[in-house]
Amino acid sequence: MKFLLLVLAALRFLTQVIPASAGGSKCVSNTPGYCRTYCHQGETALFMCNASRKCCVSYSFLPKPDLPQLIGNHWQSRRRNTQRKDKKQQTTVTS
């Protein structure tokens, strides 16, 4: 029983003394990332925290890129035009 109490006391002491570094320290205060040696799956490195650690940020926190939207069926209409040209060439060759 005394041994169990000694083990529990030692574990409680160690949890207060040893920092929890499994997740890494926070990057700059405005960045929602953590300084790590290797980024986890689903994360990307934005910048270096120091010479050996990267600021890893989850993809869900990154802004979505503004891509231009296609208007209507632009690509399909171009495809139809090329098919018409091919048909015209076939009819002129056979005539």
From Swiss-Prot:
The keyword Ubl conjugation does not apply. GO terms for cellular component: extracellular region. The keyword Disulfide bond applies. It is found in: Secreted. One of its GO terms (biological process) is innate immune response. Disulfide bonds join C27-C55, C35-C49, C39-C56. This is Beta-defensin 132. It comes from Pongo pygmaeus. The lineage of its organism: Eukaryota, Metazoa, Chordata, Craniata, Vertebrata. The gene is DEFB132.
